Amino acid sequence: MNLGLAIFLIIIALLIGLVGGFYGARAYMKKYFQDNPPISEDMIAAMMAQMGQKPSTKKLNQVMNMMKHQQQK
């Protein structure tokens, strides 16, 4: 097999793999976020209410900031 042809086919295969991997990962993440949406302030307020706490705006902001800080680590 010609060396130039082999290199060309390897590069084409890599490009096809990159594009396929990108779209596969994108579809997986879309499905994941549909099945498991990120937690929102409303969900935190509902959890606090179920635990018997009054969900004030200050408490909600504190919890959201703590969660954002944990995600950045």
UniProtKB/Swiss-Prot annotation:
Top-level taxon of origin: Bacteria
Any one cellular-component term (Gene Ontology): plasma membrane
Keyword terms: Cell membrane, Membrane, Transmembrane, Transmembrane helix
Principal subcellular localization: membrane
Family matches, as InterPro entries: UPF0154
Keyword field contains Transmembrane helix: yes
A Pfam family assignment: UPF0154
Membrane topology reported for the UniProt record: Single-pass membrane protein
Transmembrane segments: 3-23
Compartments reported by the entry: Cell membrane
Sequence similarity: Belongs to the UPF0154 family.
Protein name, per record: UPF0154 protein LGAS_0795
Organism: Lactobacillus gasseri (strain ATCC 33323 / DSM 20243 / BCRC 14619 / CIP 102991 / JCM 1131 / KCTC 3163 / NCIMB 11718 / NCTC 13722 / AM63)
